[in-house]
Amino acid sequence: MAVQWKTKEVSEQLGVNPTTVQRWVKFFGIQCETNEHGHLLFEKEHLTVLKAIQNQLKSGKKMRDVVIEENEQLIQKPETQPMVATEQYEQRTKQFMEKIAELEKQLSQKADDVVSYQILKHRAEIDEMFKTLQSLELRMAKVEEQLEKQQEEFPLAAGDVPKRKRSFMRLFSF
């Protein structure tokens, strides 16, 4: 069995942070074994690849420009997905746009239905208030009529002050 190192040990050998090693492994797709705790295990070949990456980065290259030539079998190439035909893409886009337009139309119709329902409900409330107002006006008119009748029949009870009768003679008394 070959010698295996954990991420921390490899990072110490390279003089970098352990998260840097993990980032390189992920970015470049380096295939490593993992132990039962999920820790990455590196072999001598992995270490040479990581040193090559480190040297290229130290020389000023960006990570996307780094080329790994040695031990390429350790690098997992990203799978390229097949291209979709332009016609198929446009057809699918058109279907999506039609579906979106249909959903917008349904949403608009639903909103119109809700507004119509609310208007009908408000109209019913206004009609009910109008009927209540009319009945109150009738009751007020009846109460006013009764009050006028009582004032005619019983002027003193209604609060009228009786008129004083002055005799003609009293006017000249000193």
Swiss-Prot record:
Bilayer-spanning residue ranges: none
GO BP term, example: chromosome segregation
Coiled coil region boundaries: 84-157
Superkingdom to which the source organism belongs: Bacteria
Keywords, comma-separated and alphabetical: Cell cycle, Cell division, Chromosome partition, Coiled coil, Cytoplasm, DNA-binding, Sporulation
Localization per Swiss-Prot or TrEMBL: Cytoplasm
GO terms for MF: double-stranded DNA binding
Alphabetized InterPro entries for the sequence: Chrosome_anchoring_RacA, DNA-bd_dom_put_sf, MerR-type_HTH_dom
Main localization, broad class: cytoplasm
GO cellular component: cytoplasm
Annotation: DNA-binding region: 7-27
Pfam families: MerR_1
Function summary: Required for the formation of axial filaments and for anchoring the origin regions at the cell poles in sporulating cells, thus ensuring proper chromosome segregation in the prespore. Binds in a dispersed manner throughout the chromosome but preferentially to sites clustered in the origin portion of the chromosome, causing condensation of the chromosome and its remodeling into an elongated, anchored structure.
HAMAP family, A to Z: RacA (MF_01170)
Similarity remark: Belongs to the RacA family.
Name recorded for this polypeptide: Chromosome-anchoring protein RacA
